[in-house]
Amino acid sequence: MQKGIKFRIYPNREQKNFIHQTLGCCRFIYNRGLAMRKEGYENGEKIGYSQTSAMLTELKKQEEFAFLKAADSIALQQSLRDLDRGFVNFFEKRASYPNFKSKHNRFQSYRTVNQKDNIRIVGRYIKLPKLGFVKIRQSMEVEKINHVIIEHTPAGKYFAVLNVDFEPEPRSNAGGTIGIDVGIKAFYSDSNGNMVSNPRYLERSMRKLIREQRRLSRKQKDSHNREKQRIRVARVYEKVTNQRNDFLQKQSTMLVRENQTICIEDLNVKGMIRNHKLSKSIASVSWAKFFEMLEYKAGWYGNEIHRVPTMYPSSQTCSCCGYRNPRIKNLGIRIWECPKCHAVHDRDTNASINILKKGLQMQSA
């Protein structure tokens, strides 16, 4: 199996210049390939990866585009493969039509592949094609590296995301089952009666973020001080993102390791974000990313993920007798008593138990 491990790297000035040169060349080739495929489509021609790769070879022969020879050649080819994958995802209706890349995008990355051991970690350094040895902050040991994505973030930092082979550790509970009901106040409640609070990282950083953004708005446009302040704002956002990702990684790993079967609600998160009263809170808790982590980690450990339909009334149904109480549509009701069997329910715990029951029912159907 494969997974990505992200480490921070510290290139020197010359290496930074090369990284940005390669980023620019990859963006140029990607956009050139996209324009070629778009024009071909309009003229009824079928343009694929092989045609765009031949285009790259021809461009390198022209003196006007001699700068392409200085970049990482593997990275240029990978940008065309990424473009091809974008079209595959578009035609299979998994993504929208590929867009042109802008140099004004503050987040930039390129991918390069390990060939003949030209990517490896040696002590406190990582060897990368054409970059040589770059200082790396390595927090764990890695085996053979398949490929690397070099990232430059809006906060001005550089990272290497290593794709490596790994063997997942055995689960602590091979037969466990659990239902998960996500929320805003509590990040999720489970069918065992546990509740995990929403850490609200963005809300906790909002005062500092507003202060830094206010300072940014006062800086003169295109000035050096404005760029320094922009980086300060980006670092606040980056800290919130890192805190949230760490929380999601730990919660998803714990659930997958401790349970064989996980039942979740198949929420239309994009549709829910259209509600302007809840959009900020929903985006902040990152349910979609949490579900995505559960899915790919379940693939590692051989777990089963069952998605219960959105329209299933998990909160309104009594988990003891099955009575449906339409009065519970009111989101303000957190504790309720079943009129039929008189069981007292916590709204979220009851919903998670019903999600588990429905998911197991779908599994056996």
How would you name each of these model-derived features?
Residues M1-A365:
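Nucleic-acid substrate recognition interfaces
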